[in-house]
């Protein structure tokens, strides 16, 4: 394991990551979570390219879009229009007229700041050049592109011109100034990154002689571009001699460095695959990356404070010539796309959403087109998912039914956040009538959109529906407008039980006309008439026995209309319960009061608290008072409380005194009483007895009495029974969490690096002065225990039965986010939370039958000496440490075990285990930690650096399952440590998995590796993994498919299939399920993204489901049944449960006939648990065919 000192790397172990509230429940292999769009998905339509001349027709088109569920109109805002008169002479009048028309229709408006030319490209129906005055700002050589044949292109400014950023900054600033008043209708802004509004080079331009499916041409032949390439190479290598050494050339001058002189020959002669070729392609893309950073920074500078919306940019779907063997990916590379991983990372770094196109297209990868658009969409979308980059989609060409189905497949498979259809005239005729294409768009795309209940700009109608139908639908139209398609829109559950709710933007209409049904053609009766709802909030109650229902003004009693997630100011109040069922009576400062007693507050996610969120519009404070709903009020000296926007916690005062308000949510420090019994009223102690959880109350074990005080004051506890009460009241015990007594050989572990997993409590991000900085991979990022708690369902639904989290001890460095540089053993690091929050995590994991393993470091502390002293007491004594200097490469290479155990690992202070005081304190500490937390197992870091004698003592003191990290490839060396600990991470198997599955080597290596199991005490408890936080991700290191080395998922799936079905405890590192592909530390420690619809998440969930339902696959015996270079099979058995696993490691389909199975007779039918095919044993054997890289798991 590697560590860093100062700015060095430190290995931190974690593997896990979970969730965002995933709703999938895994009940059977075919019942994993279905694919879905993102929670905020919306469907938009692209407006015309040219100016609108007939506003009446355009407004009819907009109204039809609105009536059919379209969210927004996306519009090119042409630089050539708005600044044509001269530098900084802007005219925005046309686009203000445009925005007003959109606003009138009740739609949103998504502007594209189009800094490119319109005209000359496929689909262009206008001619809008760049502002003519631009040519005076620089030379043509600087500002234009030039291709291989010498054609000069001025579709967009060259990113290499130094003035490009300044011009865009001025344009963005003027837009922000002029459209600040339209912020309510602008949910997003797009940036043009180059030709056709895409971040690319103008490599395929018909006016330059290109026609489909031509490769296109490189655009790096101006002197400016050539000099930029030369400078970049000199900067990279440092001298011409080193360039020659790298490229195998004999250049005598930097001026001899040029882009490829023959673009076609660059491919046919193999130049693209040479060191020179790779350097050129990498530099060529880097120009686009830098340009994206420049325009992204300018946009955030000018737009964030004004609009506060997401900003996006687009890359082109260059899908042809992808698999042409003569020039693989030539079209993409001419456009500037050499490494999608790196390019999409730039979107992440620039905090920009990514729009991708050609979602409607299918692959046809044969000559002459070699077109693979569907594969390309999958590749780009997968990388974006893995990196947490938000995706939006477009079609490339007009589309129909099958195209819409293809779009639906992609947006749901990869959790897209939006889709924009090109263009409006394909959906709506000039008279406002729909075309045939609109129905397909509505069926497959608009139907996926989430209700926009709060963001509209017109009049709004909010309806609470008292449930007659359990799942009511509302079929409606703005009065005089168009109806929704029957049965209409499904209403969502309201914040008050027994009601559904919807808010509809009706544009300029004054009423909403509606009817209700159950979605199955059963309609609410109103004597065949529709109901009419006025603007504002109304409550509808169905009539009895088929009679018409009634409409009353306002929300139902107890509702909180302001809790709907509006776009205005919000106040969230946590109320520490004095009243068991508190009400809040409130008004936005200066506004109107709720009707007394106000709104009943709901139980918060933190025990002992109630909570409410109120939308206060443009007000800056919420004025409030609390009561119990029965006219008993909290006292604040007759004054009301004032809460500012954001989150606050209110604690009632003692003895009638005023309560206190502090900023932020409560810490969650809650004492859980396992079985606590108390009287609810001291005056009625013979009355009902309740058993509940008590919050923040200290009770002695024996006889105690708990009583809520009156008037909302804090609770009290006394150490005797109340007069006349039962003297044998059972208070249970105030205990810490307890272990699940886990059989670890049955578990499947998800490894979590806590700081990089999920930020559930931003209030602790800057703990101890070591601030969170997401832009620096070596510093804290904000993940914490609350984040893991929030994502437990994400982990559970993936089928994992255990989590392993990185160390929890307090650190004292801005670089110690990983937890391996302990300062205080007896304190939890505040970045992660508190001891109470850690206990809560353990309890809630145990509630879901998830065991918890914690990483611990007993070899060393952080690097606190010399100069800064030692770790915190009692680890603050010089003789508790070795002072033998750093372990060197020579020590490792010569296997100097004495130095390996007694030297400093990367400068970290090595503990002296031979000192009894040190050894005893470490054993005391681990007993304390286990007792406090109730964790179920330990992962020990840097075990090969710890004396084996101490390990044995430590293992006995812990008296729990221990798994050691012995970073070494020799199974005899690693296996010896299982004589002192319960288990070891199987690094020898890791190296074999990497070779066999990641680099297509012989499956016989698996057989050879299993022959080394004799070195382990019990190989069934070896931790088996494909990668972790100390090594490159599997997808980074894997070789990929020959001829298409970007295609690595099949290799990963084969490795996962092996890992989750073979002997040992499988351990999957967080992010694997999202297709993460980071390289060496810290690139392999990415922040998590939680897409439960990701193909890899679903695949892992299916494998875990099979494993969890078959004891044989957990810790059953394992016997090899077949091995050759490309195929492997084994059988696992336990107590009558039999499973046979087949793995094809080839890139071709493979068929084998395999026999000699145990405990299975002729005629036995076996079913593949990963799909639906089955086989039957005949003559003692099975014949199976597996697709390339496929894994099959057959059971009875």
From Swiss-Prot:
Pfam family membership, one: CBM_25
Catalytic residues (UniProt): 198 (proton donor), 394 (proton acceptor)
Region (Beta-amylase) residue spans: 36-454
Positions that bind Ca(2+): 83, 87, 170
Enzyme class: hydrolase
Effect of substituting residue 358 to S: 60-fold decrease in activity
Gene3D superfamilies for the chain: Glycosidases, Golgi alpha-mannosidase II, Immunoglobulins
Co-factor remark: Binds 1 Ca(2+) ion per subunit.
Ranges for the Sequence repeats: 455-558, 565-668
Keywords of the record: Carbohydrate metabolism, Disulfide bond, Glycosidase, Hydrolase, Metal-binding, Multifunctional enzyme, Polysaccharide degradation, Repeat, Secreted, Signal
Role, per record: The precursor protein is proteolytically cleaved to produce multiform beta-amylases and a 48 kDa alpha-amylase after secretion.
Protein name in the entry: Beta/alpha-amylase
Organism: Paenibacillus polymyxa (Bacillus polymyxa)
The organism's taxonomic lineage, starting at the top: Bacteria, Bacillati, Bacillota, Bacilli, Bacillales
């Amino acid at each position: 394991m590697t560590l860093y000192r100062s700015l060095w790397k430190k290995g931190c172990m974690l593997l896990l990551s979970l969730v965002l509230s995933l709703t999938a429940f895994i009940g059977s292999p075919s019942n994993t979570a279905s694919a879905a769009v993102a929670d905020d998905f919306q469907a938009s339509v692209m407006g015309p390219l040219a100016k609108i001349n007939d506003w009446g027709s355009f407004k009819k088109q907009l109204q039809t879009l609105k009536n059919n569920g379209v969210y927004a109109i996306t519009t090119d805002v042409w630089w050539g229009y708005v600044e044509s008169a001269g530098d900084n002479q802007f005219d925005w009048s046309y686009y203000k007229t445009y925005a007003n028309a959109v606003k009138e229709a009740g739609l949103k408006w998504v502007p594209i700041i189009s800094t490119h030319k319109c005209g000359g490209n496929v689909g262009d129906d206008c001619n809008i050049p760049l502002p003519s005055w631009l040519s005076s700002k620089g030379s043509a050589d600087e500002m234009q592109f030039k291709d291989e044949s010498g054609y000069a292109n001025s579709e967009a400014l060259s990113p290499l011109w130094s003035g490009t950023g300044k011009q865009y900054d001025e344009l963005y600033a003027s837009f922000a100034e002029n459209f600040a008043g339209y912020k309510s209708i602008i949910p997003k802004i797009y940036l043009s990154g180059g030709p056709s509004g895409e971040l690319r080079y103008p490599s395929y331009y018909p006016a330059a002689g290109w026609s489909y499916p031509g490769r296109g041409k490189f655009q790096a032949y101006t002197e400016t571009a050539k000099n930029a390439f030369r400078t970049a190479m000199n900067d990279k290598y440092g001298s011409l001699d080193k360039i020659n050494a790298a490229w195998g050339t004999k250049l005598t001058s930097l001026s001899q460095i040029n882009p490829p002189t023959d673009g076609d020959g660059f491919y046919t002669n193999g130049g693209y695959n040479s060191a020179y070729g790779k350097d050129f392609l990498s530099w060529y893309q880097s120009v686009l990356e830098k340009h994206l950073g420049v325009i992204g920074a300018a946009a955030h500078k000018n737009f964030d404070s004004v609009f506060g919306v997401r900003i996006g940019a687009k890359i082109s779907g260059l899908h042809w010539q992808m698999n042409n063997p003569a020039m693989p990916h030539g079209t993409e590379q001419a456009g500037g796309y050499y490494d999608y991983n790196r390019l999409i990372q730039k979107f992440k770094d620039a905090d920009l959403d990514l729009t991708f196109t050609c979602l409607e297209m299918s692959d046809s990868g044969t000559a002459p087109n070699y077109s693979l658009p569907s594969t390309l969409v999958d590749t780009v979308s997968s990388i974006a998912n893995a990196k947490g980059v938000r995706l939006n989609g477009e079609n490339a060409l007009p589309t129909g039914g099958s195209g819409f189905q293809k779009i639906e497949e992609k947006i749901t498979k990869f959790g897209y956040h939006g889709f924009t259809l090109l263009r409006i005239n394909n959906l709506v005729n000039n008279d406002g009538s729909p075309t045939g294409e609109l129905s397909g768009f509505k069926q497959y795309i608009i139907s996926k959109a989430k209700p926009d209940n709060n963001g509209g700009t017109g009049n709004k109608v909010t309806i609470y529906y008292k449930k007659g139908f359990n799942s009511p639908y509302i079929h409606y139209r703005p009065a005089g407008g168009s109806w929704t398609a029957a049965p209409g829109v499904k209403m969502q559950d309201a914040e008050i039980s027994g009601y559904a709710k919807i808010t509809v933007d009706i544009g300029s209409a004054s009423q909403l006309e509606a009817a209700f049904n159950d979605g199955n053609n059963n309609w609410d009766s109103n004597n065949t008439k529709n109901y009419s709802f006025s603007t504002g909030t109304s409550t509808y109650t169905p009539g009895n026995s088929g009679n018409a229902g009634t409409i009353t003004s306002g929300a139902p009693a107890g509702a909180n209309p302001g809790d709907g997630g509006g776009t205005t100011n919000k106040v969230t109040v946590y109320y520490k319960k004095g009243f068991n069922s508190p009400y809040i009576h409130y008004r936005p400062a200066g506004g109107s009061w709720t009707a007394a007693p106000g709104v009943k507050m709901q139980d918060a996610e933190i025990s002992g608290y109630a909570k409410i969120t109120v939308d206060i519009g443009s007000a800056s404070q919420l004025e409030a008072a609390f009561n119990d709903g029965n006219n008993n009020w909290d006292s604040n000296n007759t004054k009301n409380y004032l809460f500012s926007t954001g989150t606050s916690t209110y604690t009632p005062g003692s003895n009638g005194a005023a309560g206190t308000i502090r900023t932020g949510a409560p810490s969650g420090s809650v004492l859980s009483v396992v079985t606590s019994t108390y009287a609810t009223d001291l005056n009625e102690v013979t009355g009902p007895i309740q058993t509940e959880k008590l919050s923040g109350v200290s009770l002695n074990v024996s006889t105690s009495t708990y009583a809520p005080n009156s008037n909302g004051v804090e609770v009290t506890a006394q150490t005797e029974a109340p007069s006349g009460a039962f003297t044998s009241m059972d208070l249970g015990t105030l205990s810490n969490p307890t272990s699940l007594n886990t059989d670890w050989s049955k578990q499947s572990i998800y490894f979590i690096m806590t700081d990089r997993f999920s930020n559930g409590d931003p209030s602790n991000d800057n703990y101890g002065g070591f601030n969170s900085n997401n832009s620096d991979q070596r510093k804290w990022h904000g993940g914490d225990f609350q984040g893991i708690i929030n994502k437990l369902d994400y982990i559970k639904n993936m089928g994992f039965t255990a989590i392993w989290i990185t160390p929890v001890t307090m650190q004292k460095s801005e670089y110690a986010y990983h937890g391996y540089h302990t300062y205080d053993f007896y304190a939890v690091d505040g970045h992660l939370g508190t001891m109470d929050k850690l206990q809560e995590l353990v309890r809630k994991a145990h509630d879901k039958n998830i065991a918890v393993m914690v990483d611990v470091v007993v070899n060393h502390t952080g690097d606190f000496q010399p100069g800064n002293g030692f770790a915190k007491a009692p680890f603050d004594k010089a003789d508790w440490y070795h002072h033998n200097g750093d372990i060197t490469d020579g020590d490792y290479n010569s296997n100097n075990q004495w130095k390996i155990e007694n030297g400093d690992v990367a400068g970290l202070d090595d503990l002296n285990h031979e000192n009894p005081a040190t050894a005893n304190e470490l054993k005391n500490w681990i007993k304390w930690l286990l007792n406090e937390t109730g964790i179920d197992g330990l992962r020990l870091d840097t075990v090969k650096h710890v004396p084996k004698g101490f390990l044995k003592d430590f293992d006995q003191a812990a008296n729990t399952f221990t798994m050691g990290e012995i970073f070494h490839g020799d199974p005899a060396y690693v296996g010896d440590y299982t004589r002192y600990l319960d288990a070891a991470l199987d690094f020898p198997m890791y190296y074999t998995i990497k070779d066999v599955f990641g680099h297509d080597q012989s499956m016989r290596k698996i057989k050879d590796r299993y022959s080394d199991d004799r070195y382990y005490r019990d190989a069934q408890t070896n931790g088996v993994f494909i990668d972790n936080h100390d090594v490159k991700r599997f997808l980074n290191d894997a070789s990929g498919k020959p001829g298409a080395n970007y295609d690595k998922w099949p290799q990963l799936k084969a490795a996962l299939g092996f890992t989750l079905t073979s002997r040992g405890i499988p351990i999957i590192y967080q992010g694997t399920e999202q297709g993460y592909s980071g390289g060496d530390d810290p690139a392999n420690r990415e922040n998590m993204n939680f897409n439960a619809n990701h193909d890899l998440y679903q695949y892992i969930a299916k494998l875990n489901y099979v494993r969890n339902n078959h004891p044989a696959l957990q810790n059953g015996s394992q016997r090899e049944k077949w091995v050759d270079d490309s195929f492997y099979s084994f059988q696992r058995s336990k107590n009558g449960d039999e499973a046979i696993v087949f793995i094809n490691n080839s890139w071709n389909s493979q068929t084998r006939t395999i026999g000699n199975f145990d405990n299975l007779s002729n005629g036995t039918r076996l079913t593949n648990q990963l799909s639906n095919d089955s086989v039957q044993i005949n003559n003692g054997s099975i014949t199976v065919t597996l697709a390339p890289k496929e894994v099959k798991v057959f059971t009875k």
